[in-house]
């Protein structure tokens, strides 16, 4: 029996939680959950076999268990997930942008709500409200949060199609007919990726755009990382190239004949650009040298 002398519970070790809770739970979910095709339309947004496999791949990658991470990435791929033809197809409030072929786990939102931040019936997304250029009138709300830095913007390679679909900068394509000016933010930039125009969300609490928590591009980059860390650097080119090709970076020579260290840097760069502002960066940096990578 447990002693009652010390009433303060002690903290379990990290590895105990991983090995006895997180991994068994996700393994069981992978074995028992339906695939996305087995769900009805009414069940869209529920966790699937693919979601469990993708999350388990992240866990194994974090622990440096690369063979098992690769196994789970392959499991996701075998379930039929694919990249959307266009990067911007992954984001937006239109029905065509929701639960796409690339989406593995997606938080569902509903724009018809009367409640504010604290309302229990509030089912709208707030990303567009928070990230729209401050006081621009381009989106409902527009607080101007999460402004990209110059250092981040400089990471885009010439010809990368994702730049114009991720950030607003002076000279970028207009947003709903509106020209962006550098004076609209402190850094000269705002996030574009999650913005929903007034025509689709007229107020700050009416945004129906979903949020993709896990998508296939992430899995492909995890697969590339696992292969490279296993010493299979040439094989890592394949999933990496798939992601870069959609972004318009079609010169295969840019990622060929690299050392393991060079490929590692390429993959890390690609994750930063492909998954920008989607909530993965902090976890990636912790995984890479306990945050020293930053």
What feature does the model see in each segment?
Residues 48, 149-150:
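Residue-level signal for threonine
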Residues 1-119, 157-294:
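Acidic/polar-rich alpha-helix caps and helix-coil junctions
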Residues 127, 153, 169:
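Extended polysaccharide-engagement surfaces of secreted carbohydrate-active enzymes
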Residues 122-144:
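Short, cationic low-complexity segments
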């Amino acid at each position: 029996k447990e002693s009652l002398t010390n009433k303060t519970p002690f903290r379990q070790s990290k590895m105990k939680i991983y090995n006895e809770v997180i991994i068994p739970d996700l393994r069981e979910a992978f074995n028992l959950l339906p695939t996305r095709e087995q769900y009805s339309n009414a069940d869209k947004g529920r966790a699937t076999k693919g979601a469990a496999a993708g999350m388990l791949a992240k866990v194994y990658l974090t622990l440096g268990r690369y063979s098992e991470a690769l196994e789970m990435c392959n499991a996701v791929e075998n379930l039929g997930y694919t990249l959307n033809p266009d990067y911007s197809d992954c984001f937006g409030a239109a029905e065509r942008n929701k639960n796409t072929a690339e989406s593995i786990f997606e938080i569902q939102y509903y724009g018809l709500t009367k409640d504010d931040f604290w309302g229990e019936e509030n089912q709208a997304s707030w990303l567009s409200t928070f990230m729209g250029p401050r006081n621009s009138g381009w989106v409902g709300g527009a607080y101007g949060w999460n402004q990209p830095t110059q250092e981040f913007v400089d990471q885009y390679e010439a010809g990368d199609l994702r730049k114009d679909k991720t950030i607003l900068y002076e000279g970028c394509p207009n947003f709903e007919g509106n020209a962006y000016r550098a004076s609209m933010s402190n850094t000269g930039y705002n996030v574009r990726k999650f913005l929903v125009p007034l025509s689709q969300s007229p107020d700050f609490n009416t945004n129906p755009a979903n949020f993709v928590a896990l998508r296939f591009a992430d899995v492909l980059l995890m697969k590339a990382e696992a292969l490279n860390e296993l010493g299979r650097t040439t094989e890592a080119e394949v999933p990496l190239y798939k992601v870069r090709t959609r972004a318009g970076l079609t010169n295969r020579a840019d990622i060929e004949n690299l050392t393991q260290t060079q490929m590692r840097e390429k993959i890390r760069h690609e994750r930063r650009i492909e998954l920008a502002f989607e909530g993965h960066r902090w976890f990636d940096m912790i995984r890479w040298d306990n945050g020293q990578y930053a």
